[in-house]
Structures are given as structure tokens and as C-alpha cells.
């Protein structure tokens, strides 16, 4: 049997809904996208959501709406995918990378606090693997540093402190302290890429908390303008009889979601609670199997105060370096089991080396990376395949 890491779970209902969208005559941003936005907002317990073509676009447009640019600093983790930091570069701001805490996937919050300056305008925590970060601690830090905050836009001034923008690409459906991811950070970006728990092939969504003195509809409209060339009407509004005329408010960007993408998402969202439950079952099987294996360390996806979305099953192999880790990956592949690594820290990548970052300054992030292997975890994985992964993984590590 060949076992992939994370294929999309697309069934006949998704296919039927896409066909219906194609037959409807409306395939770009339209009624299905608007309905998907409403359902995402309801699911996340927020007032509004906006759907775009990627989580990357969601984060970048948020930074642009905040007025963050050259001369500003944005803090994020060194242990993440490039999208988290690249959007900071896109707007001309300076990324400030923080090492992880010892033995953790989250930023070292003491180092994060010490990195805050008068130029710091936002912090982007990363909810890696689907586990929500400690936002209580993050908010405690940004609230304690209000005195040094220097807003440079009306929205920043209304927020009144450093903005917290969650990179929750992995964490749609996760919870912490009974609060749904999407209703915790000031702004929350989700990914619906093909490998994610809920997919629209490509795509993403953004939710946000109310800002005192700022109308939610105004915020939604700004995201519409930013994502559709600054056009005052979307394609759906322009098709209304006699409503052809529009204005271009600003020379903006093009990153809207289509109704074909939303058609997939609407069905995926109907199935999502069952998909999350299956992921929890699979994680339970892995956890129980590896509990007796003292060389394998795993994440705590579920606890008294949190429930993960179960997006990735990260393992760490004790007393293992990169060379042996990579050899294990090859040997798993020889048995037709695909695995992955999440993530190679950004300071090890050429782009970030060129920005002056050096992995020697991020020893904890490197320690998390050097012996990490991500095992298959997806809702098409059968119990038999899961047992095959477990038995082979333990066998290979033991020899």
C-alpha cells in the first residue's frame, strides 16, 4: 500500500456542488462565496469573515489595511513556513524573527517581549500543527507595552496597541479555553489549501474581532477593495440591472475567492465536524502506540484547556540528528510511506540568510527541526494503513 502524507478528502457532494456552480452561470466571486463567508463567521463565532485566494493574501492585506510598511517592524516565529514572514517583506516592513521556547513550537515569549520596540506594529503568532498558541500570554505582553506603541494609521490608533494577527493556517476548528480559533486574535488568517483539513483547492479566510470606533462593515469593505483592484463594486453587484458604473478607489490587488472554490468549501464545512472527529481518532491511535516507545516524542493535541484541529502529526526522535532523521524518511519511503518535515526554520533558507538571519541565533528552533518527522494524518487514512505506519515507523527507528 502507498500512503501519502495529506491528500485532499473530496467526495461526491463536493463534486456535485462544483458542477452546480458551473451550471449556475456564476463562477467567480458571487453568491456561494458570500454564503461561505457567512458560514465561516458563524462557525468561528465572529461577526464577519472575508474569503480570499490564500491565507497569504489574508495576512498581507491585513498588514496593508493596518498601514504597516517601511520603517515598521513585525514580530513572528523563526519556526514557520515562509508565508508568515514573506508578507512582512511584501509590505516593506522588517521581519523580526523569534526563536522558539526550549522544547516548544511556540515563540519564546520572553524573547518576543524583549524584541518589542517603538517600531513594532504587529505580532504574528503561528498556530502550528493546529494547536492554538498561548494568546493570554501574548495579549498580556502587548497590553503591558502599550506605552511604547506608536500608531501610524487610524486603524492602529483605534486598536491602541500592537496588533495580534494569528497565522492559523493549520488551526481552523481548533479551540483554547473554550474559544474558537478565529475569535481569539485581533485578526485570524486561515488556509484552505489542498493539504489543509478543509480545502477549497487554494483559498483562505480572514476573521477579526470588533474594533472600538471602527464599523465592521467598513472593515469588510476595505478587504473587498484591497482584494479586487480597488473596485467600488464586485462583479456580482455590477451585474444588477442599471448598475454597470463603478469607481477605482485605489490601485489595489487581485486575490478574491471564486464561487467554484467556495462550492467545495461549503460542502467541506458541512462535513467538518466529522472530519475533525476522525482526525482525533487517528491521533489517539498514534498517541497510544507511541506512548510505550520512549524514543518518540509527540505533541499534546488535546488537553483540559485546548483542542487542536489535528492538522499535522509531528514527532521528534530522541538523540537523532538531521542525517539520521533524513535516513529514516528515506527508509519509510522505501516502504511506501510518505512523511514530511515541518518546518525547516526560516534562518536556514536562502531568502532569510540574505536578510541577515543566521540559524546559530535560533538554537531551539533548530533543535525542534533536526529530529522532526511528520507522519501521515488525513481523513482518507484507514485504520489498517495507520497500523502499517505505526509498525514500520517503530521498526525503522529501532534498527
Specify the residue positions occupied by each region the protein language model found.
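Amphipathic, non-transmembrane alpha-helical secondary structure
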Residues: 16, 60, 109-117, 136, ...
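Phosphate-binding glycine-rich loop
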Residues: 26-73, 87-89, 97, 146-150
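Conserved active-site segment immediately N-terminal to the catalytic lysine
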Residues: 152-198, 244-248, 297
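PLP-dependent aminotransferase-like
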Residues: 64-168, 175
Amino acid at each position: 500500500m502507498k500512503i501519502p502524507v495529506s491528500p485532499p478528502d473530496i467526495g461526491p457532494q463536493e463534486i456535485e456542488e462544483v458542477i452546480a456552480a458551473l451550471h449556475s452561470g456564476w463562477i467567480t466571486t458571487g453568491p456561494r462565496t458570500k454564503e461561505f463567508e457567512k458560514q465561516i463567521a458563524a462557525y468561528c463565532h465572529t461577526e464577519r469573515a472575508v474569503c480570499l485566494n490564500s491565507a497569504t493574501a489574508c495576512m498581507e492585506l491585513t498588514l496593508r489595511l493596518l498601514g504597516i510598511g517601511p520603517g515598521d517592524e513585525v514580530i513572528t516565529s523563526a519556526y514557520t513556513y515562509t508565508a508568515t514572514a514573506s508578507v512582512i517583506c511584501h509590505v516593506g516592513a522588517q521581519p523580526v524573527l523569534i526563536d522558539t521556547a526550549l522544547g516548544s513550537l511556540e515563540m519564546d515569549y520572553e524573547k518576543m517581549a524583549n524584541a518589542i520596540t517603538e517600531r513594532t506594529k504587529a505580532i504574528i503568532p503561528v498556530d502550528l500543527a493546529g494547536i492554538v498558541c498561548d494568546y493570554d500570554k501574548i495579549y498580556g505582553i502587548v497590553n503591558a507595552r502599550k506605552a511604547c506603541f506608536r500608531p501610524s494609521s487610524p486603524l492602529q490608533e483605534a486598536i491602541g496597541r500592537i496588533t495580534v494577527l494569528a497565522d492559523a493556517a493549520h488551526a481552523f476548528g481548533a479551540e483554547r479555553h473554550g474559544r474558537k480559533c478565529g475569535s481569539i486574535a485581533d485578526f485570524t488568517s486561515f488556509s484552505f489549501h489542498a493539504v489543509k483539513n478543509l480545502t477549497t483547492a487554494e483559498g483562505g479566510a480572514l476573521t477579526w474581532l470588533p474594533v472600538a470606533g471602527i464599523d465592521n462593515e467598513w472593515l469588510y469593505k476595505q478587504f473587498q477593495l484591497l482584494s479586487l483592484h480597488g473596485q467600488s463594486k464586485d462583479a456580482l453587484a455590477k451585474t444588477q440591472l442599471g448598475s454597470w458604473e463603478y469607481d477605482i478607489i485605489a490601485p489595489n490587488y487581485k486575490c478574491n475567492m471564486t464561487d467554484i472554490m467556495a462550492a467545495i468549501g461549503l460542502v467541506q464545512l458541512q462535513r467538518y465536524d466529522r472530519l475533525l472527529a476522525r482526525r482525533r481518532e487517528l491521533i489517539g491511535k498514534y498517541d497510544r502506540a507511541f506512548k510505550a516507545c520512549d524514543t518518540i516524542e509527540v505533541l499534546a493535541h488535546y488537553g483540559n484547556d485546548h483542542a487542536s484541529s489535528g492538522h499535522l502529526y509531528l514527532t521528534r526522535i530522541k538523540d537523532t540528528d538531521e542525517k539520521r532523521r533524513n535516513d529514516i524518511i528515506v527508509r519509510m519511503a522505501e516502504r511506501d510511506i510518505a512523511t514530511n518535515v515541518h518546518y525547516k526554520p526560516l534562518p536556514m533558507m536562502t531568502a532569510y540568510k540574505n536578510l541577515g538571519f543566521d540559524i546559530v541565533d535560533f538554537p531551539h528552533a533548530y533543535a525542534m527541526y533536526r529530529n522532526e518527522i511528520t507522519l501521515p494524518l488525513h481523513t482518507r487514512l484507514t485504520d489498517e494503513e495507520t497500523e502499517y505506519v505505526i509498525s514500520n515507523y517503530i521498526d525503522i527507528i529501532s534498527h
